[in-house]
């Protein structure tokens, strides 16, 4: 939905007809109605939440001579792409996920799968505030795209991308790659496909570099991560388990996620996205010649999977089961590139309570949090905090409308009093001689 700064009232550019305003008119034209509503919104931003009935009432307060119905206000505002409280698109119902195979749960945590809520982690025992529930290393470690250059020059670890402070490091005898230590070297199961010319790995260095360059040029982290993930499926000694675990992550098509972007985005922008997706698919599909990899079933859901599951660009098996609350009871901290994350209790947690993290900055306001969650994770948050703040907002709006009504009535009464005074003054005449009564 358009914001106030997007509204244009130039009659040459307006999408609705403009008619000259008649001073005696009691039926407002579309432009007048839109302007009246926008004036109310500008007076107090909170009024953007008002429904058509209350908004129509406020308009008629300041334009008492207008013949205006709630239905007409709705129609006019919708035509101007300023729909009132129109339902926002959410894609949470399209997200698919499964129980993760081979997952060792932390001692005090259990995994439950509910029909209406999906996967979630719950306290199996009482948990004390600040207690560490678990720590885990990344299932998929994705180097920042800005580190690709230093990795290629041997100035950063070929696995974790950490820049070297000196020229020390474990060198590859066959290429320019270096690792922090033997631990990083051992974990780097995709190295041959990414750096060497060998064909036995099904992917060559030249093909991978072309794909990598495309990701860097377009700043496309999700595509880069998806490429790394499928290289693991091809190269990892435990590739069957890796693929099953990959498919268990919550998944949704990137095209479905894109629908949640505000209506103010143009059709042209959507078409541009689709062109880029198809080019990205072609680049990745070239790497996976002997692998079944489709645009609709693997590529688009793969992009969506990374976007809704990554934490600072990396993916974690256990952490991915945590659901969101704007008042989380656990804290997920990034310990380091190779150390992974640590999950601690923010408060005492009772047995049976669900564990919640936060997907967004809890310092943000209600509207900002909900917008971020709807666009990036597909749902409209109704956690305890959001419901409480929404109630408070509605109470404020009711009070605001009431105060505006009282204020307007006072002004009307004041004007009526002035008019009566003027009328009485005009009715007194001093130009006639008084009559003498016999």
Curated annotation (Swiss-Prot):
One of its GO terms (biological process) is methylation. Its EC number is 2.1.1.-. It catalyses: L-lysyl-[histone] + S-adenosyl-L-methionine = N(6)-methyl-L-lysyl-[histone] + S-adenosyl-L-homocysteine + H(+). It is found in: Nucleus; Chromosome; Cytoplasm. Residues 409-419, 428-438 have a biased composition (Basic and acidic residues). One of its GO terms (molecular function) is histone H4K20 methyltransferase activity. One of its GO terms (cellular component) is nucleus. Residues 409-438 are annotated as: Disordered. Its main location: nucleus. It is an enzyme of class 2 (transferase). Histone methyltransferase that monomethylates 'Lys-5', 'Lys-8' and 'Lys-12' of histone H4 (H4K5me1, H4K8me1 and H4K12me1, respectively), thereby controlling gene expression and remodeling chromatin structures. Belongs to the class V-like SAM-binding methyltransferase superfamily. Histone-lysine methyltransferase family. SET5 subfamily. This is Histone-lysine N-methyltransferase SET5. It comes from Yarrowia lipolytica (strain CLIB 122 / E 150) (Yeast).
